[in-house]
Protein backbone atom coordinates (compact mmCIF):
# COMPACT_ATOMS: atom_id res chain seq x y z
CA UNK A 1 0.00 0.00 0.00
CA UNK A 2 1.45 3.38 -1.03
CA UNK A 3 -0.86 5.89 0.65
CA UNK A 4 2.22 7.76 1.90
CA UNK A 5 2.56 9.16 -1.61
CA UNK A 6 -0.05 11.77 -0.67
CA UNK A 7 1.92 14.91 0.20
CA UNK A 8 0.45 16.81 3.15
CA UNK A 9 2.93 19.72 2.98
CA UNK A 10 5.75 21.12 0.87
CA UNK A 11 8.30 19.80 3.38
CA UNK A 12 7.24 16.21 2.61
CA UNK A 13 8.04 16.50 -1.10
CA UNK A 14 11.19 14.62 -2.08
CA UNK A 15 12.27 13.68 -5.58
CA UNK A 16 12.90 10.07 -4.51
CA UNK A 17 9.35 9.86 -3.15
CA UNK A 18 7.91 11.47 -6.27
CA UNK A 19 9.74 9.04 -8.54
CA UNK A 20 7.83 6.21 -6.86
CA UNK A 21 4.82 7.45 -8.83
CA UNK A 22 6.54 8.72 -11.98
CA UNK A 23 8.79 5.73 -12.78
CA UNK A 24 6.09 3.01 -12.51
CA UNK A 25 3.72 5.20 -14.53
CA UNK A 26 6.26 5.67 -17.32
CA UNK A 27 7.07 1.96 -17.31
CA UNK A 28 3.35 1.21 -17.49
CA UNK A 29 3.10 3.46 -20.54
CA UNK A 30 6.18 1.77 -22.02
CA UNK A 31 4.90 -1.77 -21.63
CA UNK A 32 1.47 -0.80 -22.91
CA UNK A 33 3.28 0.36 -26.04
CA UNK A 34 4.99 -3.03 -26.20
CA UNK A 35 1.64 -4.58 -27.20
CA UNK A 36 1.83 -2.67 -30.45
CA UNK A 37 5.57 -2.57 -31.14
CA UNK A 38 6.27 -6.26 -30.55
CA UNK A 39 3.46 -7.17 -32.93
CA UNK A 40 5.05 -4.89 -35.52
CA UNK A 41 8.51 -6.41 -35.13
CA UNK A 42 7.29 -10.02 -35.37
CA UNK A 43 4.88 -9.30 -38.22
CA UNK A 44 7.57 -7.44 -40.18
CA UNK A 45 10.15 -10.19 -39.62
CA UNK A 46 7.96 -13.26 -40.21
CA UNK A 47 5.08 -12.06 -42.40
CA UNK A 48 6.24 -8.97 -44.32
CA UNK A 49 5.80 -5.21 -44.66
CA UNK A 50 2.39 -5.55 -46.33
CA UNK A 51 1.05 -7.16 -43.15
CA UNK A 52 2.68 -4.34 -41.18
CA UNK A 53 0.87 -1.85 -43.40
CA UNK A 54 -2.42 -3.73 -42.77
CA UNK A 55 -2.03 -3.26 -39.01
CA UNK A 56 -1.51 0.45 -39.54
CA UNK A 57 -4.61 0.67 -41.75
CA UNK A 58 -6.90 -0.88 -39.11
CA UNK A 59 -5.33 0.78 -36.11
CA UNK A 60 -7.72 3.75 -36.21
CA UNK A 61 -10.40 1.30 -35.03
CA UNK A 62 -8.18 0.33 -32.10
CA UNK A 63 -7.71 4.04 -31.40
CA UNK A 64 -11.47 4.44 -31.11
CA UNK A 65 -11.60 1.70 -28.44
CA UNK A 66 -8.69 3.25 -26.59
CA UNK A 67 -10.32 6.66 -26.92
CA UNK A 68 -13.44 5.42 -25.14
CA UNK A 69 -11.35 3.74 -22.44
CA UNK A 70 -9.03 6.70 -21.92
CA UNK A 71 -11.84 9.26 -21.78
CA UNK A 72 -13.30 7.51 -18.76
CA UNK A 73 -9.97 6.28 -17.37
CA UNK A 74 -8.13 9.61 -17.35
CA UNK A 75 -11.17 11.77 -16.64
CA UNK A 76 -12.63 9.45 -14.01
CA UNK A 77 -9.31 8.73 -12.28
CA UNK A 78 -8.51 12.45 -12.10
CA UNK A 79 -11.86 13.09 -10.40
CA UNK A 80 -11.30 10.11 -8.09
CA UNK A 81 -7.92 11.56 -7.08
CA UNK A 82 -9.59 14.87 -6.23
CA UNK A 83 -12.14 13.02 -4.07
CA UNK A 84 -9.42 10.98 -2.33
CA UNK A 85 -7.40 14.12 -1.63
CA UNK A 86 -10.54 15.68 -0.17
CA UNK A 87 -11.13 12.62 2.08
CA UNK A 88 -14.26 11.61 0.11
CA UNK A 89 -13.50 7.94 -0.54
CA UNK A 90 -17.14 6.91 -1.08
CA UNK A 91 -17.51 9.49 -3.85
CA UNK A 92 -14.22 8.29 -5.35
CA UNK A 93 -15.53 4.70 -5.39
CA UNK A 94 -18.74 5.78 -7.11
CA UNK A 95 -16.73 7.63 -9.75
CA UNK A 96 -14.60 4.52 -10.29
CA UNK A 97 -17.60 2.17 -10.54
CA UNK A 98 -19.71 4.24 -12.93
CA UNK A 99 -16.70 5.09 -15.12
CA UNK A 100 -15.77 1.41 -15.43
CA UNK A 101 -19.34 0.34 -16.21
CA UNK A 102 -20.01 3.07 -18.76
CA UNK A 103 -16.70 2.58 -20.58
CA UNK A 104 -17.12 -1.19 -21.00
CA UNK A 105 -20.75 -0.92 -22.16
CA UNK A 106 -20.01 1.85 -24.67
CA UNK A 107 -16.91 0.05 -25.94
CA UNK A 108 -18.90 -3.14 -26.56
CA UNK A 109 -21.69 -1.27 -28.38
CA UNK A 110 -19.27 0.63 -30.63
CA UNK A 111 -17.42 -2.59 -31.50
CA UNK A 112 -20.70 -4.27 -32.44
CA UNK A 113 -21.55 -1.38 -34.77
CA UNK A 114 -18.11 -1.56 -36.42
CA UNK A 115 -18.40 -5.33 -36.94
CA UNK A 116 -21.79 -4.85 -38.61
CA UNK A 117 -20.23 -2.83 -41.49
CA UNK A 118 -16.59 -3.90 -41.22
CA UNK A 119 -15.72 -4.43 -44.94
CA UNK A 120 -17.06 -1.01 -45.89
CA UNK A 121 -15.27 0.66 -42.97
CA UNK A 122 -11.96 -1.00 -43.90
CA UNK A 123 -12.30 0.26 -47.47
CA UNK A 124 -12.90 3.78 -46.14
CA UNK A 125 -9.75 3.45 -44.02
CA UNK A 126 -7.69 2.71 -47.12
CA UNK A 127 -7.49 -1.10 -47.17
CA UNK A 128 -6.55 -2.18 -50.69
CA UNK A 129 -7.41 -5.62 -52.09
CA UNK A 130 -3.84 -6.65 -51.22
CA UNK A 131 -4.31 -5.73 -47.55
CA UNK A 132 -8.01 -6.48 -46.92
CA UNK A 133 -7.76 -10.06 -45.58
CA UNK A 134 -4.88 -9.18 -43.24
CA UNK A 135 -6.85 -6.18 -41.99
CA UNK A 136 -9.84 -8.37 -41.12
CA UNK A 137 -7.71 -11.06 -39.47
CA UNK A 138 -6.04 -8.54 -37.17
CA UNK A 139 -8.98 -6.37 -36.15
CA UNK A 140 -11.43 -9.19 -35.34
CA UNK A 141 -9.70 -10.04 -32.06
CA UNK A 142 -9.71 -6.41 -30.94
CA UNK A 143 -13.40 -5.91 -31.68
CA UNK A 144 -14.65 -9.16 -30.17
CA UNK A 145 -12.46 -8.54 -27.12
CA UNK A 146 -13.53 -4.90 -26.68
CA UNK A 147 -14.71 -5.25 -23.04
CA UNK A 148 -11.30 -6.69 -22.10
CA UNK A 149 -9.41 -4.01 -24.05
CA UNK A 150 -11.39 -1.19 -22.41
CA UNK A 151 -11.47 -2.76 -18.96
CA UNK A 152 -7.71 -3.37 -18.90
CA UNK A 153 -7.03 0.30 -19.65
CA UNK A 154 -9.47 1.42 -16.95
CA UNK A 155 -7.78 -0.76 -14.34
CA UNK A 156 -4.35 0.63 -15.24
CA UNK A 157 -5.38 4.18 -14.32
CA UNK A 158 -7.59 3.49 -11.33
CA UNK A 159 -5.10 1.14 -9.65
CA UNK A 160 -2.52 3.93 -9.85
CA UNK A 161 -4.93 6.49 -8.39
CA UNK A 162 -5.78 3.97 -5.67
CA UNK A 163 -2.21 4.45 -4.45
CA UNK A 164 -0.60 1.40 -6.07
CA UNK A 165 1.40 2.59 -9.10
CA UNK A 166 3.80 -0.34 -8.79
CA UNK A 167 0.98 -2.91 -9.07
CA UNK A 168 -0.39 -0.95 -12.03
CA UNK A 169 3.01 -1.29 -13.68
CA UNK A 170 3.15 -5.01 -12.91
CA UNK A 171 -0.15 -5.57 -14.72
CA UNK A 172 1.32 -3.91 -17.82
CA UNK A 173 4.65 -5.75 -17.46
CA UNK A 174 2.96 -9.13 -17.13
CA UNK A 175 0.74 -8.46 -20.13
CA UNK A 176 3.73 -7.26 -22.17
CA UNK A 177 5.77 -10.37 -21.38
CA UNK A 178 2.77 -12.58 -22.18
CA UNK A 179 2.42 -10.74 -25.49
CA UNK A 180 6.08 -11.28 -26.41
CA UNK A 181 6.05 -14.99 -25.51
CA UNK A 182 2.90 -15.72 -27.49
CA UNK A 183 4.07 -13.61 -30.44
CA UNK A 184 7.09 -15.91 -30.63
CA UNK A 185 4.91 -19.03 -30.32
CA UNK A 186 2.07 -18.02 -32.65
CA UNK A 187 4.03 -16.13 -35.32
CA UNK A 188 7.55 -17.53 -35.08
CA UNK A 189 6.78 -21.20 -34.37
CA UNK A 190 3.19 -21.90 -35.43
CA UNK A 191 3.30 -19.50 -38.43
CA UNK A 192 -0.15 -18.08 -37.68
CA UNK A 193 0.77 -14.78 -39.32
CA UNK A 194 -1.12 -11.62 -38.50
CA UNK A 195 -3.86 -13.60 -36.72
CA UNK A 196 -1.22 -14.84 -34.29
CA UNK A 197 -0.13 -11.27 -33.61
CA UNK A 198 -3.67 -10.21 -32.76
CA UNK A 199 -4.28 -13.27 -30.57
CA UNK A 200 -1.01 -12.76 -28.67
CA UNK A 201 -1.94 -9.14 -28.01
CA UNK A 202 -5.40 -10.13 -26.79
CA UNK A 203 -3.99 -12.72 -24.37
CA UNK A 204 -1.62 -10.11 -22.95
CA UNK A 205 -4.52 -7.71 -22.44
CA UNK A 206 -6.60 -10.48 -20.87
CA UNK A 207 -3.90 -11.25 -18.29
CA UNK A 208 -3.64 -7.56 -17.33
CA UNK A 209 -7.44 -7.35 -17.07
CA UNK A 210 -7.63 -10.39 -14.77
CA UNK A 211 -4.89 -8.93 -12.55
CA UNK A 212 -6.96 -5.74 -12.29
CA UNK A 213 -10.05 -7.67 -11.21
CA UNK A 214 -8.01 -9.57 -8.61
CA UNK A 215 -6.59 -6.31 -7.22
CA UNK A 216 -9.94 -4.65 -6.61
CA UNK A 217 -11.52 -7.82 -5.24
CA UNK A 218 -8.71 -8.58 -2.77
CA UNK A 219 -6.78 -5.53 -1.56
CA UNK A 220 -7.77 -2.04 -2.74
CA UNK A 221 -6.67 1.00 -0.72
CA UNK A 222 -9.31 3.68 -1.30
CA UNK A 223 -11.53 2.44 -4.14
CA UNK A 224 -13.98 -0.43 -4.33
CA UNK A 225 -16.77 -1.58 -6.66
CA UNK A 226 -20.16 -0.25 -5.64
CA UNK A 227 -23.57 0.01 -7.27
CA UNK A 228 -25.01 2.42 -4.70
CA UNK A 229 -25.66 5.99 -5.73
CA UNK A 230 -24.41 5.61 -9.31
CA UNK A 231 -25.62 8.19 -11.81
CA UNK A 232 -25.37 8.85 -15.52
CA UNK A 233 -24.45 12.44 -14.65
CA UNK A 234 -21.29 11.23 -12.88
CA UNK A 235 -20.37 9.06 -15.88
CA UNK A 236 -20.85 12.06 -18.17
CA UNK A 237 -18.70 14.21 -15.87
CA UNK A 238 -15.89 11.64 -16.00
CA UNK A 239 -16.11 11.41 -19.78
CA UNK A 240 -16.08 15.19 -20.25
CA UNK A 241 -13.09 15.60 -17.94
CA UNK A 242 -11.23 13.01 -20.03
CA UNK A 243 -12.25 14.58 -23.32
CA UNK A 244 -8.65 15.40 -24.19
CA UNK A 245 -7.66 11.73 -24.35
CA UNK A 246 -10.72 10.77 -26.38
CA UNK A 247 -9.98 13.65 -28.75
CA UNK A 248 -6.36 12.50 -28.92
CA UNK A 249 -7.24 8.91 -29.83
CA UNK A 250 -9.95 9.97 -32.28
CA UNK A 251 -7.52 12.44 -33.82
CA UNK A 252 -4.89 9.72 -34.14
CA UNK A 253 -7.47 7.54 -35.86
CA UNK A 254 -8.40 10.23 -38.37
CA UNK A 255 -4.91 11.59 -38.98
CA UNK A 256 -3.52 8.06 -39.39
CA UNK A 257 -5.90 7.63 -42.31
CA UNK A 258 -4.67 10.93 -43.76
CA UNK A 259 -1.04 9.96 -43.11
CA UNK A 260 -1.58 6.63 -44.89
CA UNK A 261 -3.40 8.10 -47.87
CA UNK A 262 -0.80 10.86 -48.28
CA UNK A 263 2.07 8.37 -48.02
CA UNK A 264 0.30 6.07 -50.49
CA UNK A 265 0.03 8.97 -52.92
CA UNK A 266 3.70 9.95 -52.76
CA UNK A 267 5.42 6.62 -52.06
CA UNK A 268 2.96 3.75 -52.51
CA UNK A 269 2.67 0.87 -50.05
CA UNK A 270 6.31 1.38 -48.99
CA UNK A 271 5.30 4.82 -47.79
CA UNK A 272 2.49 3.35 -45.67
CA UNK A 273 4.97 0.88 -44.16
CA UNK A 274 7.36 3.77 -43.37
CA UNK A 275 4.51 5.64 -41.65
CA UNK A 276 3.80 2.49 -39.62
CA UNK A 277 7.41 2.26 -38.43
CA UNK A 278 7.57 5.93 -37.46
CA UNK A 279 4.29 5.64 -35.55
CA UNK A 280 5.59 2.63 -33.63
CA UNK A 281 8.82 4.38 -32.64
CA UNK A 282 7.16 7.67 -31.72
CA UNK A 283 5.04 5.79 -29.16
CA UNK A 284 8.23 5.13 -27.17
CA UNK A 285 9.24 8.79 -27.24
CA UNK A 286 5.83 10.28 -26.48
CA UNK A 287 5.43 7.65 -23.77
CA UNK A 288 8.20 9.35 -21.78
CA UNK A 289 6.26 12.63 -21.71
CA UNK A 290 2.91 10.98 -21.12
CA UNK A 291 4.25 8.69 -18.40
CA UNK A 292 5.91 11.56 -16.54
CA UNK A 293 2.85 13.79 -16.79
CA UNK A 294 0.39 11.08 -15.72
CA UNK A 295 2.71 10.00 -12.90
CA UNK A 296 2.83 13.55 -11.59
CA UNK A 297 -0.91 14.04 -12.08
CA UNK A 298 -1.92 11.69 -9.25
CA UNK A 299 -0.07 13.48 -6.40
CA UNK A 300 -1.15 16.76 -8.05
CA UNK A 301 -4.76 15.61 -7.93
CA UNK A 302 -4.44 14.54 -4.28
CA UNK A 303 -3.00 17.95 -3.36
CA UNK A 304 -5.56 19.89 -5.37
CA UNK A 305 -8.43 17.89 -3.87
CA UNK A 306 -7.08 18.78 -0.42
CA UNK A 307 -6.81 22.45 -1.53
CA UNK A 308 -3.07 22.33 -0.81
CA UNK A 309 -2.02 24.72 -3.57
CA UNK A 310 1.53 25.26 -2.29
CA UNK A 311 2.21 21.55 -2.89
CA UNK A 312 0.71 21.87 -6.40
CA UNK A 313 3.09 24.71 -7.25
CA UNK A 314 6.17 22.81 -6.08
CA UNK A 315 5.15 19.71 -8.03
CA UNK A 316 4.62 21.82 -11.15
CA UNK A 317 8.17 23.20 -10.83
CA UNK A 318 9.51 19.66 -11.08
CA UNK A 319 7.62 19.31 -14.36
CA UNK A 320 9.00 22.55 -15.78
CA UNK A 321 12.58 21.47 -15.05
CA UNK A 322 11.98 18.10 -16.65
CA UNK A 323 10.48 19.57 -19.83
CA UNK A 324 13.30 22.09 -20.14
CA UNK A 325 15.87 19.28 -20.46
CA UNK A 326 14.19 16.05 -21.61
CA UNK A 327 13.07 17.21 -25.10
CA UNK A 328 16.63 18.13 -26.12
CA UNK A 329 17.99 14.76 -24.99
CA UNK A 330 15.08 12.91 -26.59
CA UNK A 331 15.40 14.53 -30.01
CA UNK A 332 19.18 14.14 -30.03
CA UNK A 333 18.77 10.45 -29.25
CA UNK A 334 16.07 10.08 -31.91
CA UNK A 335 18.27 11.65 -34.58
CA UNK A 336 21.33 9.56 -33.76
CA UNK A 337 19.58 6.25 -33.08
CA UNK A 338 16.97 6.39 -35.86
CA UNK A 339 18.75 3.76 -38.03
CA UNK A 340 18.99 1.36 -35.09
CA UNK A 341 15.29 1.71 -34.25
CA UNK A 342 14.11 1.34 -37.84
CA UNK A 343 16.30 -1.76 -38.31
CA UNK A 344 13.90 -3.71 -36.09
CA UNK A 345 11.20 -3.28 -38.73
CA UNK A 346 12.92 -3.02 -42.12
CA UNK A 347 16.11 -4.26 -43.77
CA UNK A 348 18.95 -1.69 -44.04
CA UNK A 349 19.29 -0.42 -47.58
CA UNK A 350 15.67 -1.06 -48.49
CA UNK A 351 13.41 1.73 -49.68
CA UNK A 352 11.24 1.45 -46.57
CA UNK A 353 14.30 1.63 -44.29
CA UNK A 354 15.74 4.78 -45.89
CA UNK A 355 12.34 6.45 -46.03
CA UNK A 356 11.60 5.70 -42.37
CA UNK A 357 15.00 6.90 -41.09
CA UNK A 358 14.84 10.26 -42.89
CA UNK A 359 11.17 10.63 -42.00
CA UNK A 360 11.72 9.90 -38.30
CA UNK A 361 14.45 12.55 -38.07
CA UNK A 362 12.04 15.18 -39.43
CA UNK A 363 8.99 13.90 -37.55
CA UNK A 364 11.05 13.83 -34.34
CA UNK A 365 11.47 17.61 -34.36
CA UNK A 366 8.01 17.64 -32.82
CA UNK A 367 9.44 15.98 -29.68
CA UNK A 368 11.11 19.30 -28.85
CA UNK A 369 7.69 20.87 -28.26
CA UNK A 370 5.19 18.08 -27.60
CA UNK A 371 6.28 17.39 -24.00
CA UNK A 372 5.14 20.69 -22.53
CA UNK A 373 1.94 20.52 -24.63
CA UNK A 374 1.11 17.09 -23.20
CA UNK A 375 1.83 18.22 -19.64
CA UNK A 376 -0.30 21.36 -20.05
CA UNK A 377 -3.27 19.24 -21.20
CA UNK A 378 -2.91 16.66 -18.41
CA UNK A 379 -2.43 19.41 -15.79
CA UNK A 380 -5.76 21.01 -16.69
CA UNK A 381 -7.52 17.64 -16.71
CA UNK A 382 -6.05 16.88 -13.27
CA UNK A 383 -7.57 20.10 -11.94
CA UNK A 384 -10.97 19.13 -13.35
CA UNK A 385 -10.79 21.56 -16.29
CA UNK A 386 -11.27 18.97 -19.01
CA UNK A 387 -12.54 21.47 -21.58
CA UNK A 388 -9.22 23.39 -21.57
CA UNK A 389 -7.30 20.11 -21.70
CA UNK A 390 -9.46 19.07 -24.64
CA UNK A 391 -8.76 22.34 -26.46
CA UNK A 392 -4.98 21.86 -26.23
CA UNK A 393 -5.23 18.26 -27.40
CA UNK A 394 -7.66 19.13 -30.20
CA UNK A 395 -5.20 21.69 -31.57
CA UNK A 396 -2.06 19.54 -31.46
CA UNK A 397 -3.57 16.20 -32.40
CA UNK A 398 -6.25 17.17 -34.88
CA UNK A 399 -7.01 20.68 -36.11
CA UNK A 400 -3.48 22.00 -36.70
CA UNK A 401 -2.07 18.59 -37.62
CA UNK A 402 -4.78 17.98 -40.21
CA UNK A 403 -4.23 21.47 -41.63
CA UNK A 404 -0.50 20.92 -42.07
CA UNK A 405 -1.01 17.39 -43.44
CA UNK A 406 -3.14 18.93 -46.18
CA UNK A 407 -0.96 21.98 -46.89
CA UNK A 408 2.70 20.99 -46.44
CA UNK A 409 2.82 17.95 -48.79
CA UNK A 410 1.65 20.21 -51.62
CA UNK A 411 4.96 22.06 -51.36
CA UNK A 412 7.35 19.56 -49.76
CA UNK A 413 5.81 16.25 -50.93
CA UNK A 414 6.83 13.36 -48.62
CA UNK A 415 8.88 15.61 -46.32
CA UNK A 416 5.77 17.72 -45.80
CA UNK A 417 4.05 14.69 -44.25
CA UNK A 418 6.85 14.25 -41.71
CA UNK A 419 7.01 17.97 -40.87
CA UNK A 420 3.26 18.32 -40.23
CA UNK A 421 3.62 17.14 -36.62
CA UNK A 422 6.44 19.57 -35.64
CA UNK A 423 4.51 22.45 -37.22
CA UNK A 424 1.35 21.58 -35.26
CA UNK A 425 3.27 21.22 -31.98
CA UNK A 426 4.99 24.60 -32.38
CA UNK A 427 1.71 26.48 -32.80
CA UNK A 428 0.03 24.54 -29.99
CA UNK A 429 2.91 25.51 -27.71
CA UNK A 430 1.65 29.11 -27.72
CA UNK A 431 -1.68 28.04 -26.22
CA UNK A 432 -0.02 25.60 -23.81
CA UNK A 433 2.32 28.26 -22.44
CA UNK A 434 -0.63 30.60 -21.95
CA UNK A 435 -2.43 28.02 -19.80
CA UNK A 436 0.74 27.32 -17.80
CA UNK A 437 1.21 31.01 -17.02
CA UNK A 438 -2.06 30.98 -15.14
CA UNK A 439 -1.66 30.24 -11.44
CA UNK A 440 -3.04 27.04 -9.95
CA UNK A 441 -6.80 27.38 -10.16
CA UNK A 442 -8.41 27.79 -6.75
Regions found by a protein language model. Name each.
Residues 1-22, 80-147, 189-243, 300-366, ...:
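Short alpha-helical transmembrane segments in multi-pass integral membrane proteins
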Residues 9-47, 60-75, 79, 104-111, ...:
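N-terminal transmembrane alpha-helices
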Residues 20-39, 141, 175, 204-208, ...:
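Transmembrane helical elements of multi-pass membrane transporters/channels
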Residues 34-53, 122-129, 185-192, 253-284, ...:
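Helix-terminus/linker motif at the lipid-water interface of multi-pass membrane proteins
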Residues 43-63, 129-134, 194-195, 234-241, ...:
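Interfacial/gating helices of multi-pass transporter permease domains
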Residues 52-112, 149-168, 274-338, 370-389:
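Small-residue-rich hydrophobic transmembrane alpha-helices
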Residues 64-67, 179-183, 208-213, 283-287, ...:
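Hydrophobic transmembrane alpha-helices of multi-pass small-molecule transporters
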Residues 73, 142-160, 168-176, 197-210, ...:
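Short runs within selected transmembrane alpha-helices of multi-pass transporters and secretion channels
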